[in-house]
Amino acid sequence: MLVDTGLGLISELRARLGWAALLQIVPVTVVAYNLLWFIYTSFFSSLRKIPGPFLARISRVWEIKKAATGNIHEIVMDLHRCHGPIVRIGPNRYDFDTMEALKIIYRIGNALPKADYYIPFGLPSSPNLFDVQNPARHSAMKKQVASLYTMTALLSYEAGVDGQTIILKEQLQRFCDQKQVIDLPQFLQYYAFDVIGVITVGKSMGMMETNSDTNGACGALDAMWHYSSMMAFIPHMHAWWLRLSSLLPIDVPIKGLTEYVEQRIIQYRLKAAEFGDDDALKGENNFLAKLILMERQGTVTSTETQQAVGLNIGAGSDTTANALSSILYFLYTNPRTLRRLREELDTHVKEDPIRFQQSQSMPYLQAVIKEALRLHPGVGTQLTRVVPKGGLVIEGQFFPEGAEVGVNGWALYHNKAIFGNDASVFRPERWLETKGNLNIGGSFAFGAGSRSCIGKNISILEMSKAIPQIVRNFDIEINHGDMTWKNECWWFVKPEYKAMIKPRAA
């Protein structure tokens, strides 16, 4: 609708004025608008005293330039260290790093809507559970698939995860025997993809066994996050670009993964049709089988099935892979912590792989996971919400309707006022101590409130399986070779390093 209106307006102006006049008017209008906005925000707005970069006061160019460096998470942390709990990152965008702001902005009741920033993370004509902006619509969509994420459902996926965790151990042993330097974060993404493939469509993608990016899925997701995280700053251009790309011979990176998902959906529908009833699917412990059953019962549509499957694979694999990579990095570069975790595992774990319910009763393991997610939250950008009618008071400052506000997880989790002077230190023990509101922010790595990640327990299931398996059997020499620890933020903050797998020494 917006694309058609915009194209119609341009055509009408061109017809009335001609191209020459139109090309003169557009830049003058843009300059005039930004000048007037600067005058308003500098001298008349109630938010004029909020600190931040000068360019961010009048334009989104500052945020776009910083995001394009792949280092926006570090830059926003530095802004908060310099200016305090509220900083301006755009003409109408404000970032926070406090628990008070988190509880207000991501409240469960009367939830704030997501900003237009999220539009490029899906299709404008068919919003998914992640990018849908309206809270009521999100609630309705979430109810449709909530049964797939219950604890009962989670435990039904465990056997499939066990199978892939055993393959993980076997492949790491092969790297160990060959004394091979590997891109460990990349291999952990293969593990995450294979696991989420089994959970979602009932079949591994075979990445670990081939040590390769089958279907180009990893590369496709990287390209998608690059695109969406930058297009998010000009979200209404997303629909224009999609229309343009459909008319040009442009390669679509996600094509291989999309075809894989579509093939599995077709196979399951044919399987259900062949038997003529639901019995063929009831014994299958994966998302797709359950969704096809829901389709046949009329509770979800075929489009919603495809959306749910695609979102589960896309978001689930990167979230888990990045978390596993950071957990192992912090563990194997902190020998004291590694020793304490091994003591807990050696004392209490007899099964191989560990049972999920047992892992949940192991306090130090869970503290290690929480602490790694604190130091390295998966998402490096602000989780943006729009202030509703009537405005909001956050950190003592009134924000009018329409202002875009949010908390950056990296800034929050590195805030010394919350986590102490050792906020930048990997110390899992902090989660075993009782310090007031510390645990309130403990799950913000997966978002907060009604819009927190619906699949977070699946990610925790994978972590709780893989980490004990690796720690009990292997030593890892981090930064072996010419690649040191590096992070790049394209929505997700992806760790990069190389490692050598070795037999456990003690």
Curated annotation (Swiss-Prot):
**Job of this protein:** Can detoxify the phytoalexin pisatin from garden pea. Pisatin is an antimicrobial compound produced by pea in response to infection by plant pathogens.
Q: Which cofactor does it need?
A: heme
User: What would you give as a GO molecular function for this chain, any one?
Assistant: heme binding
Supply the alphabetized keyword list: Heme, Iron, Metal-binding, Monooxygenase, Oxidoreductase
Q: What is its EC number?
A: 1.14.-.-
**Pfam families in the record:** p450
- InterPro entries reported in the protein's UniProt record: Cyt_P450, Cyt_P450_CS, Cyt_P450_E_grp-I, Cyt_P450_sf, Cytochrome_P450_monoxygenase
Q: Which family does it belong to?
A: Belongs to the cytochrome P450 family.
The entry marks the following residues as binding heme, namely: 453
Please verify whether the record's keywords include Secreted.
no
The protein's name in its UniProt record:
Pisatin demethylase
Write down the top EC class of this protein.
oxidoreductase
